[in-house]
Design a protein with these regions (language model features):
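Cell-wall glycan-active module
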Residues: 1-170, 175, 185-331
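Functionally critical loop-and-helix segments that line ligand-binding/catalytic clefts
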Residues: 181
Length: 331
């Protein structure tokens, strides 16, 4: 009996020690929120004590879907259902998409594709609390704690400013919010009241989501009418040195073509470009990325993500052209 009581006492002390460490982190975070951003520490602590640690956040960020080979990842998004959904979405929101294209200089098909990849055009039912995910990753992520701490700060800043309970924000396993899956810092920087109702609502207003995606891409130097990406053929023995594994276009296209990297299309020779090799379903695929591809990658810095958006945008555009030819309209 004494040994059992000693065991219970030891476990209790251990539990208290673990809780103390968590509380200490929370106190420091809350104090910083008040001193740096004016959000009362007591309010921040109350919010944090209402959050739950979610193993899902740690597991999914450690093994993101985007890490799959392109040939596998492509099958998740370039499907008949996703393309048909993109056509339906476009027809239902054409006015807002065209207005966003004109105002921000961003392809309406790319805007639609991002919303298609992020939340299947708003059809996904977001059930996870963004505060749970961000708090878990801020206090427990071994590699990206600083990033998620910043995003948790922004979530609380926005909630305090808008007088909203942050525990009501629904999001992804990484804490992204609403139809466009904006991280809280992007919500603040690029959120747009595109429907003119006096507030930016990325959770319930698809019009606001469309404008916000366009503003984000415009802010990352997407330029309407310029190329995004094109598949290429390679030959010779010098092209390999240009396979940079970087999505940032830094060399003139002519330098690539002079070294056996030939785009499947006509482009201005001085256009900045980069070569990237992907593992496709049928083997290696060679792609030339331009500035607009890099702009898309700023939404999510994984090449598979940007490729999915680019590919889906092309399919949506083809579907819209078909619908226009056939006289198909939104129901």
């Amino acid at each position: 009996m004494k040994k059992y009581l000693l065991f219970l006492l030891t476990m209790t002390l251990f539990a208290r020690s673990e809780a103390f460490e968590i509380n200490k982190d929370i106190h420091e975070f809350a104090a910083n929120m008040e001193s740096c951003y004016g959000v009362p520490a007591s309010k921040v602590e109350w919010w944090l004590y209402g959050t739950d640690i979610k193993e899902l956040a740690l597991n999914r960020t450690a093994k993101p879907t985007e890490a799959k080979p392109w040939g596998e990842y492509k099958k998740l998004f370039i499907t008949d259902d996703r393309i048909r959904g993109g056509l339906d979405f476009y027809l239902a929101n054409e006015g807002d998409l065209i207005r966003a294209e004109h105002q921000f200089g961003v392809s309406r098909y790319v805007i639609a594709a991002i919303l298609g990849v992020e939340t299947n055009y708003g059809k996904y039912q977001l059930k996870l609390r963004a505060a749970d995910m961000l708090a878990t990753l801020a206090f427990n992520s071994p590699n990206r704690s600083a990033f998620f701490t910043k995003e948790l700060q922004w979530l609380f800043i926005i909630a305090d400013r808008e007088d909203v309970d942050p525990l009501t924000y629904k999001g992804s396993y990484a804490g992204a919010i609403g139809y466009p899956q904006f991280m809280p810092s992007n919500f603040d920087s690029y959120g747009v009241d595109f429907d003119g109702d006096g507030k930016t609502d990325l959770v319930n207003s698809m019009t606001d989501a469309i404008g916000s995606v366009a503003k984000y891409l415009s802010g990352h130097r997407f330029i309407f009418g310029e190329p995004i990406a094109v598949q290429a053929d390679v030959s010779g023995d010098t092209w390999q040195k240009y396979d940079s594994r970087s999505m940032r276009p830094l060399r003139p296209l002519k330098e690539l073509t002079d070294n056996g990297i030939i785009p499947r299309g006509d482009f201005l020779p001085d256009t900045k470009a980069t070569l990237y090799t992907l593992d496709g379903a049928d083997g290696k695929e060679y792609w030339i990325f331009f500035n607009n591809f890099y702009a898309i990658s700023r939404y999510n810095p994984r090449v598979n993500y940007a490729m999915a958006v680019f590919s889906l945008s092309q399919e949506i555009e083809k579907a819209v052209d078909w619908a226009n030819d056939e006289g198909v309209y939104a129901e």
